[in-house]
Amino acid sequence: VVLGTLILAISITRSPIMIPLQAFQGVAVSAFLKQRHRPVAAFIKPAAAVVAVGAAGALAAYLVGPLLFRLIYPPAAGAESAYEAAASGITLGALVFASALLALMTLSGNMALAVNQHRIYLAGWVVAAAVTLSLAFLIPAPLVPRAIVALAVGPVCGFVVHMVGVALASRTEEAHAE
């Protein structure tokens, strides 16, 4: 029952950030293309917006998420303890912020694609998936905290791969231009 509630909580907390970002990806790539000469600098404003929205969303999920979750998806008889574990304010807030970290990695991936760094893009996603899956199965912790850590740390690792890769590629291009 906890797993089902957790899957529902993950789905609900990812949608408000990821669905608009999916629609925005073409615009993001276009903006990064216009600033190819300084991709990391062009990344800062949209990244700050994603983090700010994620932080505000996490706070809102922490404060009112459990109430709304129970209102929209009332627990079945005997499933109340699963809701305490997977739909608490701290869990919903953490899941929302983890989705903002995934959005940040998605945005950094768009930047990598815009500057023609397809291998960096792929490497970031492969690293994120590998880290997420590894942590999800290997952390010796209960399901909910293990899922939160895996869903947050995996995208951060992919984001770091994207950012370091694009920064190094930009420096290499600058050195060749001189």
Q: What is the role of each PLM region?
A:
Residues 13, 77-108, 122-123, 130, ...:
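Alpha-helical transmembrane segments of multi-pass membrane proteins
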Residues 1-16, 69-78:
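Helix-terminus/linker motif at the lipid-water interface of multi-pass membrane proteins
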Residues 56-83:
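Short membrane-interface helical motifs at transmembrane helix boundaries
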Residues 31-34, 40, 97-124:
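Membrane-interface junctions at transmembrane-helix termini in multi-pass inner-membrane proteins
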Residues 7-10, 47-50, 92-95, 99, ...:
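Residue-level recognition of transmembrane alpha-helices
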Residues 4, 65-66, 70, 83-89, ...:
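Membrane-interface helix-loop junctions in multi-pass transport and translocation proteins
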Residues 9, 13-37, 113-114:
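Helix-loop junctions and terminal segments of transmembrane helices
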Residues 39-52, 60:
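Interfacial transmembrane-helix starts/ends
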